[in-house]
């Protein structure tokens, strides 16, 4: 509560003095248009947050509040306008912003698309092509649900998880995580455990963990209809309605963990599938979980994309158009200490004020000499 009060007070002070815009300018926000990213759009946030990951959710009502604020302070543009302007270096004479949705959840079609059409707001959707039209879950959703069920069933969740990983011969690049006694301090809850595993393992090892958890506390993927992906018919309708459709890979594998061949397969084949289905050129790509390194960016370029989007401020100097920053928002991103929508906090989010105090935890550099094992990351 103290932290939320401090954040609210700081945001109000910066907003009313205009210092938020100055800080944003010093942080480089004037040089890069604002690109916002969302994931799931739901009707009842509180109900969904009890079962699913809250940070992936925004209610339709809150999304409308945020979009209305953005619309009053920025000119909303499509990625198809924003990208070429950045490419040719043409200046923006007014603040502009673009809206994006990641992962291709069906509720974006159900709840976001009608809102966007009613308000005439351009937007983009980055989809995971292998999941389109199926009942399979995103790997991180499935992992989270399995861990939540396992932690409820196990007497000591973190300790049992460490033992499960040890039995699979899987070691995580997290200090203490491979020690059964220390692990309980690092993964105290299912969400933290999911993040440690999802961001720390290549896809082939993550699949082994999911398989082992399924053997102990299996779930029926088909029963979680709230988490299902778009159908191809929905994707086509969104495209016809004016939404830009971009790739988010074939399977949502984190590219910095994978071999060059796997990254090329994930990016190029996803692009080809979208182009074939939609009959249009696919120019935009979003990195899964916003994670990338120099090798992944190079392959994204080879796959034929003109523009790619991250979730941090780091830019690759060789490929600035393939490392365009985005700001991810969710239900609570712009709430004050009393849980109300706050224009000052929204303004600070839009101008990158909180990014000044944040530190990117990713390692974006990958030495050219690094060895790459099939299906793994550098040296692994």
Label the predicted regions:
Residues 105-106, 251, 255:
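Short, glycine/acidic-enriched loop or turn micro-motifs at the edges of active sites
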Residues 92, 105, 113-126, 176-221, ...:
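CE4/NodB-like, metal-dependent polysaccharide N-deacetylase domain
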Residues 1-100, 107-109, 135-155, 208, ...:
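C-terminal active-site subregion of NodB/CE4 polysaccharide deacetylases
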Residues 71, 115-119, 230-247, 301:
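Acidic (Asp/Glu)-rich catalytic clusters
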Residues 27-33, 37, 136-241, 372:
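Extended, charge-rich helix/loop segments that form flexible
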Residues 129-134:
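Short beta-alpha junction loops
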Residues 39, 248, 252:
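Histidine-centered divalent metal-coordination motifs
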């Amino acid at each position: 509560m103290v932290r939320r009060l401090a954040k609210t007070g700081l945001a109000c002070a910066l907003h009313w003095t205009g210092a938020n815009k100055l800080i944003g300018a010093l942080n480089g926000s004037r040089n890069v248009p604002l690109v916002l990213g969302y994931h799931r759009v739901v009707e009842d946030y509180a109900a969904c947050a009890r079962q699913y990951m809250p940070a992936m959710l925004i209610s339709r009502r809150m999304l409308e509040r945020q979009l209305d604020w953005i619309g009053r302070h920025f000119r909303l543009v499509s990625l198809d306008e924003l990208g070429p302007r950045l490419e040719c270096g043409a200046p923006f004479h007014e603040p502009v912003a673009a809206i994006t949705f990641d992962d291709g959840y069906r509720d974006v079609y159900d709840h976001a698309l009608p809102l966007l059409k009613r308000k005439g707001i351009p937007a983009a959707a980055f989809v995971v092509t292998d999941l389109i039209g199926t009942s399979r879950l995103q790997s991180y959703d499935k992992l989270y649900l399995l861990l939540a069920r396992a932690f409820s069933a196990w007497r000591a969740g973190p300790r049992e998880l460490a033992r499960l990983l040890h039995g699979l011969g899987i070691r995580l690049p997290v200090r203490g995580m491979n020690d059964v006694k220390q692990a309980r301090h690092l993964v105290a809850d299912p969400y933290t455990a999911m993040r440690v595993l999802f961001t720390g393992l290549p896809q082939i090892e993550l699949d082994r963990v999911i398989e082992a958890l399924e053997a102990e506390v299996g779930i029926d993927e088909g029963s979680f209809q709230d988490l299902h992906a778009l159908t191809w018919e929905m994707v086509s309708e969104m495209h016809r309605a004016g939404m830009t459709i971009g790739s988010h890979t074939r399977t949502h594998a984190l590219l910095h963990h994978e071999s060059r061949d796997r990254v090329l397969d994930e990016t190029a084949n996803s692009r080809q599938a979208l182009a074939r289905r939609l009959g249009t050129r696919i120019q935009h790509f979003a990195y899964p979980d916003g994670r990338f390194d120099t090798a992944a960016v190079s392959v994204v370029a080879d796959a034929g994309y003109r523009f790619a989007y991250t979730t941090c401020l780091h830019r690759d100097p060789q490929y600035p158009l393939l490392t365009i920053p985005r700001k991810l928002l969710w239900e609570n991103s712009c709430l004050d200490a009393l849980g109300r929508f706050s224009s000052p906090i929204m303004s600070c989010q839009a101008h990158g004020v909180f990014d000044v105090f944040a530190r990117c935890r990713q390692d974006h550099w990958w030495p050219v000499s690094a060895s790459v094992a099939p299906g793994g990351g550098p040296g692994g």
